[in-house]
């Protein structure tokens, strides 16, 4: 359900999925009712989209009277936006699938920089193509394993516009111990925010993803929100 246009997500995944023998249904974006029917009629087993659109699709499916028993969905590969654990649980419940996260950037290659395995204990970085570091956003110093900072990526095999220590502005941590799945690639945690959208309220670092985690856990509250910071006297209020 990624848009087939200048956005790198759809075409980037399309040919990779065909390479491993999958049949791709290029639904693109929009016309949600039609997409629900495609899921049902074609017996789709894996959904690729943003997590928020998957959540919306599950709501539309229920409105159409299409139950999870009529679908064959088993896996959801989501990306292009942050996905909190609470939103992931809602998507899994809504469609009855197993959700994984994928990280990528248009500047690097689109999707496929890193992705979760079945254990979901971090996103495995494809280190045969990318060298990842985490730095202090202010000083540029490389941080140790497990320390939070800005993700910096160097492309190792990209021929068109290679990137050397590209500053993503995404905040994460790196871990190097082997995963239970057997892969030995370094793993990055889900990004908690960006260096350019972090809010500091009365000396406290506030990330929009933290606010979303609380909102998603509340009934009758959607995943869409706006944060407004006001100055009252000499103090900021959120």
Model-inferred region functions:
Residues 17:
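Short hydrophobic alpha-helical segments of the AMP-binding
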Residues 8, 20-238:
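Active-site glycine/GP-rich loop and adjacent strand/helix microenvironment
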Residues 3-14:
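Conserved coil-to-alpha-helix start sites within the AMP-binding
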């Amino acid at each position: 359900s990624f848009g087939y246009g200048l956005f790198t997500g759809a075409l980037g995944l399309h040919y990779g999925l065909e390479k491993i023998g999958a049949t791709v249904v290029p639904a693109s974006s929009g016309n949600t009712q039609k997409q629900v029917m495609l899921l049902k009629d074609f017996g789709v087993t894996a959904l690729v989209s943003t997590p928020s659109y998957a959540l919306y699709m599950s709501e539309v499916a229920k409105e159409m009277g299409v139950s999870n028993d009529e679908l064959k969905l088993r896996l959801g590969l989501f990306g292009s936006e942050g996905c909190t654990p609470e939103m992931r649980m809602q998507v899994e419940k809504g469609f009855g699938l197993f959700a994984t996260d994928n990280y990528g950037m248009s500047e690097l290659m689109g999707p496929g920089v890193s992705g979760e395995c079945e254990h979901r204990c971090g996103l495995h970085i494809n280190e045969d193509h990318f060298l990842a570091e985490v730095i202090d956003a202010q000083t540029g110093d490389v941080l140790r394993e497990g320390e939070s900072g800005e993700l910096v990526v160097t492309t190792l095999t990209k021929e068109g516009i290679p990137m050397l220590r590209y500053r993503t502005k995404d905040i994460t941590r790196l871990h190097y111990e082997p995963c239970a799945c057997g892969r030995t690639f370094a793993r990055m945690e889900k990004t908690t925010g960006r260096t350019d959208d972090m809010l500091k309220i009365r000396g406290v670092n506030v990330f929009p993803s933290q606010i979303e985690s609380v909102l998603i856990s509340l009934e009758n509250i959607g995943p869409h929100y706006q944060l407004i910071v006001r100055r009252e006297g000499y103090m900021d209020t959120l």
